[in-house]
Amino acid sequence: MRLFLSLSLLATVTAQASPQIICDTTVPVGDGKITIELWPKSAPHGVTRLSSLVKDGFFTDLPFFRAIPNFLIQFGISPDAAMQNKWNSAGNIEDDPHSTVPFTDGIVSYAGYGPNSRSTHLFLTLGNQPGLGKSPWEVPVGKVVKGLDVMKGIYTGYGDKVDQGRLNPQRKDAKAYLAGFLRLDRFKGCKLIEGQEHQVEL
């Protein structure tokens, strides 16, 4: 008689969950919340800046001032003059390494105008956008992992009509100008959930 002995060897390792940003919005879809998973390993500079903005309350009442159907939704101008001044003074951040991650539905990236020009302006992609990702500032820093229906419900009727320059909170007429776009959606506020360590069996 042969005796067969089966041994199962289990090992555990500690893994780090990706940090997330949970945002409340004015969008009248579902609970109005959007959850963004951040990718600090591939975009360390961008994620560090974005995390700092969230923790500082920059996203409070932050309008989606540029929302183009089937393309993108841009944000990043605070209606609070002191807040915007603080982050303007912080300067731009260094570009992250080029990424081959495609710009699919719900990707989060910075807007920019040249090398090392990223500051507070970001955008969300609406649908697949193969034309994005070629500029040095267009590096995905995360992706919407919950609330895609909310993201797609952001009002896009104004398209590119909002003049970004007139949203500068230093202008005396900035609030009055913004009030003229009654249907413009916005973030009510966001909170950062740091990645938690957990055990994974191998």
Where in the sequence are the language-model features?
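Cleavable N-terminal signal peptides of Sec/SRP-targeted secreted and luminal proteins
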Residues: 2-16
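Cyclophilin-like peptidyl-prolyl cis-trans isomerases
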Residues: 13-202
